[in-house]
């Protein structure tokens, strides 16, 4: 299914399509002056707006969303409320050391609980289920790496609520021979990301936040001690600005310092038609857990509340240009469909009804970053690397503290003002990304080359 034009926002993902009719907020017309302006109506932007407004009920806060709430990564992702910070803990420890790895895990752990509590406390209609997540291996080499990860987590004391499952246990639960072993993380969940982000918008508006939709920011300037955002039909002048555009940050004009902080890379998903009772019985999966595998180019898959299965990942695209017109990837969609059938041959006749894709924010050192620009009028957040459902919400609380000039346990977290390694200029950046991408594909191919009826490799 081709990705449809941007005028059809409801078609950008299965989640948006299943949401049904959506009435976006009015665009900005004329000029407005506020205390805090936030560019980006996703998880980061709306969470920041909510938290700052709770702290400062009398403050004026405006969120400017270029498309509609739910259009970007916050409405297109897999909906995994999970504890992964950046990449695996081995990578974090190698780059940042023992103590920062532990702190990062605790932050991610707190973020998962934060999302769950906010949904429960505010009765958000997010289709949330706290069912846990498996990290599975298909090959002996993948399983050895999985065991090393678990042993490191034990060594660091961050293995709470994590258990190891054998192939026999997995086979009994899921009726497939493909899983060689797994780590099971109990304290994780899944949600419908488009419903959830629009629930955050509803809550923010109820608290007095103004959300302008279909209001792209064309130019950012910093006159005097203010920040000015020019839009097609007006302008916002603010005392402070939060840049919460993540993967779309590269498109902003007026903040050249942020251009090389991160790059967008594209991931893709498919979703089945609702499975019949017989199909569900044939594969087990009675407890509705979510999955990631232990590849370099991971697959992520999960059930939906209406009885479907989503499957994403397996490969990415790293375009060489600055456009965001890269949501169409038939080869990767076909791979995702075949991979689900490879795991569950019982589903060889299952139909797929939706296919979509979108960009995620990737820093060169594969670590999230929150920072302040210059005189601290501008705060930015980038680099969740496709694992941002949980992190973005707690990041919103952290950014609200920064906006308020507070020094808290969160603002002391080591990613604040860490100054990410910048991506090099083009074409060096593209050539480097391409080489890394091909290396990861080769890694997965080599580790999976002896798998039976191997459909996990992308050409």
Give residue ranges: language-model regions.
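Internal hydrophobic alpha-helix adjacent to the cofactor/substrate pocket in enzyme cavities
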Residues: 53, 339, 392-412
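Flavin (FAD/FMN) cofactor-binding and adjacent substrate-gating region
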Residues: 2-11, 17, 87-93, 117-131, ...
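Glycine-rich active-site loop/strand segments that organize a redox cofactor
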Residues: 76-107
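Extreme N-terminal leader/targeting segments of oxidoreductases
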Residues: 1-36, 54-55, 59-60
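Glycine-rich FAD pyrophosphate-binding loop
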Residues: 53-76
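Helical element adjacent to the flavin cofactor pocket in flavoenzyme catalytic cores
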Residues: 144, 152-154, 177-240
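Active-site-proximal substrate-binding core of FAD-dependent oxidoreductases
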Residues: 362, 402-436
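Active-site substrate-recognition segment that forms the wall
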Residues: 113, 121-129, 217-219, 225, ...
């Amino acid at each position: 299914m081709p990705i449809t034009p941007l005028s059809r926002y409801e078609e950008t993902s299965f989640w948006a399509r299943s949401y049904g009719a959506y009435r976006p907020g009015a665009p900005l017309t004329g000029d407005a002056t506020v205390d805090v302006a936030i560019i980006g109506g996703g998880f980061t932007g709306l969470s920041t707006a909510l938290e700052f407004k709770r702290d400062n009920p009398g403050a004026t806060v405006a969120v400017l969303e270029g498309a509609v709430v739910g259009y970007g990564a916050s409405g297109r992702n897999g909906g995994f409320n999970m504890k992964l910070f950046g990449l695996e803990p081995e990578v974090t420890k190698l780059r940042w050391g023992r103590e920062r790895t532990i702190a990062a895990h605790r932050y991610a752990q707190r973020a998962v609980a934060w999302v769950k509590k906010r949904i429960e406390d505010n009765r958000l209609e997010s289709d949330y289920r706290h069912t846990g997540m498996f990290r599975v291996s298909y090959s002996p080499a993948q399983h050895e790496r999985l065991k090393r990860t678990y042993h490191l987590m034990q060594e660091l004391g961050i293995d709470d609520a994590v258990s190891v499952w054998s192939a026999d246990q997995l086979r009994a639960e899921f009726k497939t021979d493909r899983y060689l072993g797994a780590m099971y993380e109990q304290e994780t969940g899944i949600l419908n990301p488009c419903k959830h982000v629009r629930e955050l918008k509803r809550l923010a508006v109820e608290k007095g936040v103004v959300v302008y939709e279909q209001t792209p920011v064309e130019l950012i300037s910093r006159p005097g001690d203010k920040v000015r955002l020019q839009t097609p039909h007006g302008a916002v002048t603010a005392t402070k600005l939060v840049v919460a555009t993540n993967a779309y940050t590269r498109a902003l004009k007026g903040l050249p310092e942020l251009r090389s902080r991160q790059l967008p890379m594209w991931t893709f998903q498919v979703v089945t038609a609702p499975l019949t009772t017989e199909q569900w019985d044939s594969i087990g999966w009675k407890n509705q857990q979510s999955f990631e595998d232990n590849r370099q180019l991971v697959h992520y898959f999960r059930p939906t509340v209406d009885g479907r299965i989503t499957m994403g990942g397996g490969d990415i695209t790293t375009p060489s240009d600055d456009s965001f017109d890269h949501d169409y990837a038939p080869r990767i969609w076909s791979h995702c469909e075949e991979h689900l059938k490879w795991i569950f041959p019982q589903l060889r006749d299952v139909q797929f009804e939706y296919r979509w894709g979108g960009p995620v924010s990737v820093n060169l050192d594969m670590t999230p970053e929150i920072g302040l620009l210059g005189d601290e009028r501008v705060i930015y957040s980038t680099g969740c690397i496709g694992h941002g459902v949980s992190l973005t919400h707690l990041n919103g609380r952290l950014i609200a503290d920064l906006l308020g000039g507070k020094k808290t346990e969160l603002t002391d977290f080591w990613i604040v003002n860490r100054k990410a390694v910048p991506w090099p200029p083009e074409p060096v950046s593209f050539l480097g990304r391409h080489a890394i991408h091909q290396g990861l594909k080769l890694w997965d191919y080599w580790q999976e080359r002896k798998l039976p009826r191997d459909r996990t490799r992308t050409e």
